[in-house]
Amino acid sequence: MNLKFAVSVWSVLLVLRLAVFAMDPEKQAVIDRYKAPFAVYLTAINDLGSALGTVKTESELIKAADKFCDEANKFVDEFNANKEQFADSQVVKSMDDDPDSKKAMEDYMESLKSKLEDARPIFENLISSLNRHSDSREINRVRDRVAATFQRIQLLYM
């Protein structure tokens, strides 16, 4: 069973790599440019999950939440910069008509969607951890900051 799974995964990766090689380098560069901020965000989520697993004090929770917010806001800024840079790009517009580019983006977005769904327990853990602590000035500040960060991220989808 594990061998079949490994062969299947390898086959999918090979097909994706071949699709990338068939794509115009300019289009691939645009896709890579859009992927970069998401890599920052996914790393921030994973780091948050790891930190929450070891948090013992309120100050450690605050530090973990602040670090996540810093990185998540960096993601939003980089994403918006890319969006602005490529707003009127002919390369981006031509990608809608290119099956290889379209497929590469769809595959990446599906993978990203799955990773973000897998991260939901981390966010739930963060929120419940913040709610378990007293209403100190610092906890309230971090709650507000986390809420504002999530709101910024949500605006990307509109």
Regions found by a protein language model. Name each.
Residues 68-138, 145:
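Long, amphipathic, charge-rich alpha-helical segments that form helical bundles/coiled-coils
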Residues 21-73, 152-158:
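Immediate post-signal-peptide N-terminus of mature secreted/exported proteins
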Residues 1, 24, 110-112:
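Short, low-complexity interaction segments enriched in Ser/Thr/Pro/Gly
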Residues 1-9:
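Bacterial N-terminal signal peptides that target proteins for export
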Residues 140-158:
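C-terminal partner/receptor-binding element of secreted or periplasmic proteins
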